[in-house]
From Swiss-Prot:
Protein name per its UniProtKB record: Long neurotoxin LNTX-2 homolog
Pfam families: Toxin_cobra-type
Keywords: Acetylcholine receptor inhibiting toxin, Disulfide bond, Ion channel impairing toxin, Neurotoxin, Postsynaptic neurotoxin, Secreted, Signal, Toxin
Known tissue expression: Expressed by the venom gland.
Signal peptide positions (record): 1-21
Function: Binds with high affinity to muscular (alpha-1/CHRNA1) and neuronal (alpha-7/CHRNA7) nicotinic acetylcholine receptor (nAChR) and inhibits acetylcholine from binding to the receptor, thereby impairing neuromuscular and neuronal transmission.
Localization, UniProt: Secreted
Transmembrane segments: none
Presence of the UniProt keyword Signal in the record: yes
Gene Ontology MF terms in the entry: acetylcholine receptor inhibitor activity; ion channel regulator activity; toxin activity
Length: 93
């Protein structure tokens, strides 16, 4: 009986969501923040606007429940480990 009870406790602990939350870099400050519950994906969106030639691509960093949908002209990268979406500034040559 004790073995059965212990097995049930272990299975319950393994199956429960233990409240782990992902940390992602989030714009506008590109600081690491804890994502809201249910948002376990970090993303980086980049695109060109009218100032792209002088300022570089626009960057949006954040958390999401699923990887955002790809739109024409927008590059999206998604990952699922803590702080896996760092902002790398564009360097002019």
């Amino acid at each position: 009986m004790k073995t059965l009870l212990l097995t049930l406790v272990v299975v319950t602990i393994v199956c429960l969501d233990l409240g782990y939350t992902t940390k992602c870099y989030v714009t506008p400050d590109a600081t690491s923040q804890t994502c809201p519950d249910g948002e376990n994906i970090c993303y980086t969106k980049s695109w060109c606007d009218v100032f792209c030639s002088s300022r570089g691509k626009r960057i949006d960093l954040g958390c999401a429940a699923t990887c955002p949908k790809v739109k024409p002209g927008v590059d999206i990268k998604c990952c699922s480990t803590d702080n896996c979406n760092p902002f790398t500034p564009w360097k002019r040559h």
